[in-house]
């Protein structure tokens, strides 16, 4: 058996517990502030550029297993799409006109699709106000409803996704668990060739969900 940890806040306790009870310690994602040799196995994302080690497996996308919460239901004979909006960060700036042009394009190009949208804690009030101008069939504005996460429902029913490039976890989660077409919304970038761009490139080269079972068979515990 093993102790599995995911995220910077868990690695120390995983190491402590595994040593105390003589268990194998497995880290999901790259534990950058720790000695990699402290872990029996590390499962890291390729866009983090992990070094080659015997105890490290680099995978294209994050391990994830979303489940629908029932916020929306599949309507038979109706196609649907989801728009997932992030916001400014240290690399990207989200211009108002970029999102407006993309939303205009979506509503013009897909008039018969059901349209869903969700924002994030980084989405500006200006972008939230813009989203409110459109007639989405289902809408979650993070600043108003921070405790609702509809991503599992979107993954279960949507035929297309439009996701801003800054939203790496959402890009990874959707591609890992859905065969739907993913359209990445480009933003103004302060730097090039970052891990965000690397992940976007990986996703653009994939047209179906990831077979985690096949990949993880390489790990022997």
Annotated model-derived regions:
Residues 34-35, 50-52, 91-93, 122-129, ...:
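Short, charged/polar "capping" segments at the starts of alpha-helices
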Residues 1-57:
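Active-site and donor-binding regions of nucleotide-sugar-utilizing enzymes
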Residues 64-125, 143-144:
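Active-site donor-nucleotide binding/catalytic segment of nucleotide-sugar enzymes
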Residues 175-218:
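Nucleotide-sugar donor-binding patch of glycosyltransferase catalytic domains
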